[in-house]
UniProtKB/Swiss-Prot annotation:
This protein's name: Carbon catabolite-derepressing protein kinase
Catalytic activity: L-seryl-[protein] + ATP = O-phospho-L-seryl-[protein] + ADP + H(+); L-threonyl-[protein] + ATP = O-phospho-L-threonyl-[protein] + ADP + H(+)
Gene coding for it: SNF1
Organism: Candida tropicalis
Function: Essential for release from glucose repression. It interacts and has functional relationship to the regulatory protein SNF4. Could phosphorylate CAT8.
GO CC aspect terms: cellular bud neck septin ring; nuclear envelope lumen; nuclear membrane; nucleotide-activated protein kinase complex; vacuolar membrane
Record-listed E.C. numbers: 2.7.11.1
Domain Protein kinase: 52-303
Organismal lineage: Eukaryota, Fungi, Dikarya, Ascomycota, Saccharomycotina
Pfam families: AdenylateSensor, Pkinase, UBA_2
Primary localization class, coarse: nucleus
Molecular function in Gene Ontology: AMP-activated protein kinase activity; ATP binding; guanyl-nucleotide exchange factor activity; identical protein binding; protein serine kinase activity
Binding site residues for ATP: L58, G59, E60, G61, S62, F63, G64, K65, V66, K81
Length: 619
């Protein structure tokens, strides 16, 4: 990696920088004074949503309009993020969006924009969120590059917020200048945490085209899975910009920019300290498997300098070995926010403690992954502990953290009405494909099916039908105590990743498939070609054709992996395509059949799964 002294050009780049980022209209720009604006009694009352008087439109984000509003009773300023349900229907399933948003209400961190409440109407979901009036990057543009101490203070706040969300299984995936806001004390507030999940399906990041300069190589190359590592890369780009006053990867021509990012080509100015250089070179690593993790960043010497105590994550080693206490305050808060039943919460905690005592998983390991109620309880308990610690340390951030949520709007449903709300499983795994809610929690009239969830919902439905079949003579379980079933895509495994890959290769070989030699970057992806036997009924199968499939291994959580199968199109066998004038038609036929029939793919995926099952039994 070459190093060069950038000297003067840095000052020019801060001007360019403005050009790059401010063609985005974004929500939190505002020039208004800090003191509350008295609401004019003559203001148009139609310009109200619930108890909020709209002051002005702040901008348009990836999710719809964002408006500045003021609570009629308290005068507190909030931002209203208005999501049109029509846009959601295209990209996703509304029931899931509402579950995800209700889980985001539990996130409480001094450096994350708080979601105070959600107002739902027939056409819109309106998120009532904390208002922060400035953007970190306007500040950088005005100041040019920052001294290291100042950049480190911002960076520590960003990393602490990201670590908090990752610990609670939410990845931002779209960290960029517009999402880094500042309050009046120049504290960072990260916006839109958890929202990328709502807008994406199996083919990741439809909204990322806004700021490709900050996107990780695996995101711009369209990888199916992008986990916590993408936030590390984006944070590295942000740190570079703060320290150098310009972007590490920049080009007016998008394909050239993508090439620079994919190759990880950037320069480090000589004026950076060795500690800052070392951290940047560990964060901006193209292969996500070799990239530094958030926890390793928090152990880095340069990073730890002058680190305020309130930003340190809780000591996880203590939590893992201790029993989970039953805290009535947390339980009542949780039943109001998420609609869980008090007895259900207590039985989940006791079960987790029993499993831990029996020498099984620790409370924060296996049980946590199998029960979203426990996830939500631990998250809220941590919030309560953090508040106590902040009070003890008399931190100046306590005000920001505890700032009261606006009183509920008259149009909110009462807390009891949310008790039938489905759980938040979709938020609780790193990738959007991993889980599908158990059917028993879905209201009967509103089952809406995600395209990617179809097989799981079908299986869950079939299983439920069997259970409810009177001929089976199975007594129906009490609905409140019903054991929730989790449905996953692909195959789950607790074996070592390399063993899993070895098993898959062995099964593919037994079935006569062929595969491309994996590159180092794609160690956990297998690109397979498979001859699909012809069937006389379809003229298109009169020739032997190759079906392509991608098999990828994901990590769901420590020691828990998921094997995912993805259909990757058709290919004509090379020996038959020579001198064939009708090749174009054949290819067209193949594409048509591929787009209308999932059976060949499902057939081969089933054979592979059965082969793996046979192998594991005989092994």
């Amino acid at each position: 990696m070459s190093e060069q002294n950038q000297g003067q050009p840095d000052q020019q780049h801060s001007g360019d920088h403005q050009h790059h980022h401010h063609h985005h209209h974004h929500h939190h720009h505002s020039q208004q004074p800090a003191q509350p604006i008295p609401i004019d009694p003559n203001v148009n009352p139609a310009n109200r949503i619930g108890r909020y008087q709209i002051i002005k439109t702040l901008g348009e984000g990836s999710f719809g309009k964002v408006k500045l509003a003021q609570h009629v009773g308290t005068g507190q300023k909030v931002a209203l993020k208005i999501i049109n349900r029509k846009t959601l229907a295209k990209s996703d399933m509304q029931g899931r969006v509402e579950r995800e948003i209700s889980y985001l209400r539990l996130l409480r961190h001094p450096h994350i924009i708080k979601l105070y409440d959600v107002i739902k109407s027939k056409d819109e979901i309106i998120m009532v969120i904390e208002f922060a009036g400035k953007e970190l990057f306007d500040y950088i543009v005005q100041r040019g590059k920052m001294p290291e101490d100042e950049a480190r203070r911002f960076f520590q706040q960003i990393i602490a917020a990201v670590e908090y969300c990752h610990r609670h299984k939410i990845v931002h995936r779209d960290l960029k200048p517009e999402n880094l806001l500042l309050d009046d004390q120049l504290n960072v507030k990260i916006a839109d945490f958890g929202l990328s999940n709502i807008m994406t399906d199996g083919n990741f990041l439809k909204t990322s085209c806004g700021s490709p300069n900050y996107a990780a190589p695996e995101v711009i190359s369209g990888k199916l899975y992008a986990g916590p590592e993408v936030d590390v890369w984006s944070s590295g780009v942000i740190l570079y910009v703060m320290l150098c006053g310009r972007l590490p990867f920049d080009d007016e021509f998008i394909p050239a920019l993508f090439k620079k990012i994919s190759n990880g080509v950037y320069t480090l100015p000589n004026y950076l300290s060795p500690g800052a250089k070392h951290l940047l070179t560990r964060m901006l690593v193209v292969n996500p498997l070799n990239r530094i993790t958030i926890h390793e960043i928090m152990e880095d010497e340069w990073f730890k300098q002058d680190m305020p105590d309130y930003l340190l994550p809780p000591d996880l080693s203590k939590i893992k070995t201790s029993k989970i206490d039953i805290d009535e305050d947390v339980i009542s808060a949780l039943s109001v926010t998420m609609g869980y039943d008090r007895d259900e919460i207590i039985s989940v905690i006791e079960k987790a403690n029993r499993e831990a005592a029996a020498g099984g998983a620790t409370p924060t390991n296996q049980s946590k992954s199998t029960n979203e109620v426990l996830d939500a309880y631990l998250l809220m308990k941590e919030n309560h502990t953090l508040v106590k610690d902040l009070k003890k340390s008399k931190s100046e951030n306590i005000e920001s953290f505890l700032s009261l949520s606006p009183p509920p709007s008259s149009s909110f449903p009462n807390p009891g009405s949310t008790s039938s709300a489905p759980g938040v499983q979709q938020s609780l795994t790193y990738q959007t494909l991993a889980t599908v809610p158990d059917l028993s929690t879905l209201p009967n009239s509103t089952i809406a099916i995600l395209p990617t969830s179809l097989p799981s919902i079908h299986r869950a439905y079939m299983m439920e039908t069997k259970v409810n079949d009177p001929q089976q003579q199975i007594p129906a379980p009490q609905p409140t105590k019903k054991l929730k079933t989790r449905w996953h895509f692909g195959i789950r495994s607790r074996s070592y990743p390399l063993d899993v890959m070895g098993e898959i290769y062995r099964a593919l070989k037994n079935l006569g498939a062929e595969w491309a030699k994996p590159t180092e970057e794609e160690l956990w992806t297998i690109r397979v070609r498979w001859k699909y036997d012809s069937t006389p009924q379809l003229r298109v199968w009169q020739r032997t054709n190759l079906m392509k499939m991608q098999i990828q291994l994901f990590q769901l959580e420590p020691n828990n992996y998921l094997v995912d199968f993805k259909f990757d199109g058709w290919e004509q066998t090379s020996d038959e395509s020579k001198n064939d004038a009708s090749l174009d038609y054949k290819q067209q036929d193949l594409d048509e059949v591929g787009s209308f029939s999932a059976y060949p793919f499902l057939h081969l995926a089933t054979r592979l799964i059965m082969e793996l099952a046979v192998n594991s039994q005989s092994g």
